[in-house]
Structure formats: C-alpha cells, structure tokens
C-alpha cells in the first residue's frame, strides 16, 4: 500500500509536471516569435514529455486505487527577452523538479514504500537526463549563439528532435 505522505507528494507533483509543460509551451511561443522554429520544436517536445510524466503519475495513483484531483496550473511569470533566457530558466526549472522528485523519493523511503520508490527510479534517471540535456544546450548556445550561421545550424539541429513516448510501463 502506498503511504499517505508519498501519495500526497505525488499528487502535488502531477500539478508540477503539468506546470512544466505549460512553462515549456511558453518557451515554445517565445522561440516561434523569434523565428527560431528548431528551438520552438525542442520545447514543444519537452512540453509533451512533461505532460506524459504527469499522466504516468496519474496512472500510478489510479492503478493503486487512489483518487487524483487536478489543481489549477499557475501561469508562468517570466520576462523572456534574449534567446538564452528560456534555456537558463529551463535548466533552473529542471533542477527544481529534480528536487521535488527527490523529496517524494525521500518520503517513500522513510515510509518503506518500496513500490513507490521503484516507480520513482525511472523519474530520478529521467531528471538526470533532463538536466544534462538542458546544460548541453546552454553550452552550445554559449559557443555558437552569437554567430548567425552557427545559430541557424543549431536551430536546424533542434528542429530534428522528435517526440518519443516514455519508456516507463506501469
């Protein structure tokens, strides 16, 4: 049986994952307005992934006969003016989400909620990948972003990213 503290934290995390999708759609809009469709694509795929994370958590709760109530999603309140802004904010946000996932894991560990710990293992790994990808993108932008030709090539690289459904099976 899932511990109450674990289930409460997962319910909050569902909202955080939907917020992440909403935030990344805001970044998507920013890059569309800048004419950087590849960067926009990268964040559109990110938004899809975050939505999937929320859905996986909802399914986990439902598979364990726990009720899920959706909460309001807060509007992102960021001032984006430079092409680097969404990248930096994205990395900052991924680090924040990693902390949230670790807090849920800690709650499950304290309660000896092994089922939830096993479920969260995938998310812990996923967050490591998310932070690495965000950091790598920042490094590329720092190297190439000021040169229009290089920015064009980086934008084309990001345009090639496609959505892949999560590997976690419940």
Show where each model-derived region lies.
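Iron-associated oxidoreductase/ferritin-like identity signal
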Residues: 1-170
């Amino acid at each position: 049986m899932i511990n109450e503290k674990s289930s409460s934290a997962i319910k909050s995390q569902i909202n955080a994952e939907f917020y992440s999708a909403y935030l990344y759609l805001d970044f998507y809009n920013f890059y569309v307005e800048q004419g950087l469709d590849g960067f926009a694509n990268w964040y559109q795929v990110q938004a899809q992934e975050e939505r999937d994370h929320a859905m996986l958590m909802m399914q986990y709760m439902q598979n364990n006969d726990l009720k899920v109530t959706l909460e309001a999603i807060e509007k992102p309140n960021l001032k984006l003016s430079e092409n680097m802004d969404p990248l930096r904010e994205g990395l900052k946000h991924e680090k924040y989400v990693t902390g949230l996932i670790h807090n849920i894991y800690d709650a499950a560990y304290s309660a000896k909620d092994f089922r939830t710990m096993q479920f969260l293992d995938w998310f812990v790994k996923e967050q490591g990948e998310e932070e690495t990808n965000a950091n790598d993108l920042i490094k590329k932008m720092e190297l190439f972003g000021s040169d229009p030709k290089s920015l064009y090539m980086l934008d084309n690289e990001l345009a090639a990213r496609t959505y892949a459904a999560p590997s976690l099976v419940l």
